[in-house]
């Protein structure tokens, strides 16, 4: 059985673990969780695809997602490609954390002569396989962090997470559940997720716990940094 979500109270810990343990993909994990990007869409991202706009005192990030192979020298670099070219908005969860991550990432990992946002240890565009390996380390360390917690519920959740299968698809599930809790409109969910097939979005309507103003409260609290 696959897990498609993380309980909201552990989501910040998940992001923080990525920042501490795998900083080279921490921004990518955030973009997956709060922008719904697939793994292949993360590694296909170029700096020119990132647009930041400011409305009032709030900033917004839009990503232009296109099917592009940044590592033509590796036949298996982009296994899934970008399934649907689109403009994707990233939810600004946890106050200014997105901007902190983005600035730190640029400063540390932006390489001259390489347009890719995510790069490997050699400074080349990161492949699907490398991202997957780095995420596997995150999974391990996240479970370990929960297991070592003094909180009984966190320890129990660590056991749960180690019992079932999950990988990068989990982040997209987190995003889908956040959106599904805010609307009962399947077309809207599909649009946010970049789905062509409505059945993919429908599963998040049938699985959701609540779909009322409580969902909008969750998104608002995530923005303010009050959850996690």
Describe the predicted segments one by one.
Residues 3, 20-22, 31, 160, ...:
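Residue-level marker of regulatory loop/turn positions in helix-turn-helix DNA-binding domains and
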Residues 8-39:
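Basic, Lys/Arg- and aromatic-enriched nucleic-acid-binding interface segment
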Residues 32, 43, 190:
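The alpha-helix within a helix-turn-helix
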Residues 45-100:
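Conserved tyrosine-mediated DNA breakage-rejoining catalytic core shared by Y-recombinases
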Residues 79-80, 219-228:
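C-terminal secondary-structure termini that scaffold catalytic or DNA-interacting sites
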Residues 85-134, 138:
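Major-groove DNA-contacting interfaces characterized by cationic-aromatic clusters
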Residues 124, 132-191:
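Short, basic (Lys/Arg/His-rich) helix/loop patches that form interaction surfaces
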Residues 193-218:
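Catalytic-site neighborhood detector that most strongly recognizes the C-terminal catalytic loop/helix
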């Amino acid at each position: 059985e696959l897990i498609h979500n993380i309980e909201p109270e552990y989501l910040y810990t998940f992001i923080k673990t990525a920042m501490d343990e795998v900083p080279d993909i921490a921004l990518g994990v955030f973009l997956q969780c709060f922008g719904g990007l697939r793994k292949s869409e993360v590694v296909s991202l170029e700096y020119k695809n990132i647009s930041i706009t400011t409305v009032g005192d709030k900033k917004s990030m839009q990503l232009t997602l296109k099917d592009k192979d940044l590592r033509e020298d590796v036949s298996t670099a982009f296994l899934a490609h970008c399934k649907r070219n689109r403009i994707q908005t990233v939810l600004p969860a946890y106050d200014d954390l997105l901007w902190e991550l983005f600035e730190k990432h640029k400063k540390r990992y932006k390489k001259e002569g390489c347009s890719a946002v995510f790069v490997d240890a050699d400074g080349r565009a990161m492949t699907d396989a490398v991202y997957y390996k780095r995420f596997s380390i995150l999974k391990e360390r996240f479970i370990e962090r929960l297991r070592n917690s003094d909180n009984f519920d966190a320890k129990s959740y660590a056991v749960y997470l180690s019992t079932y299968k999950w990988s990068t698809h989990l982040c997209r599930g987190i995003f889908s559940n956040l959106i599904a809790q805010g609307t009962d409109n399947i077309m809207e969910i599909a649009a946010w997720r970049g789905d062509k097939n409505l059945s993919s979005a429908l599963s998040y309507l049938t699985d959701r716990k609540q779909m009322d103003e409580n969902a909008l409260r969750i998104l608002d609290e995530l923005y303010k940094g009050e959850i996690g």
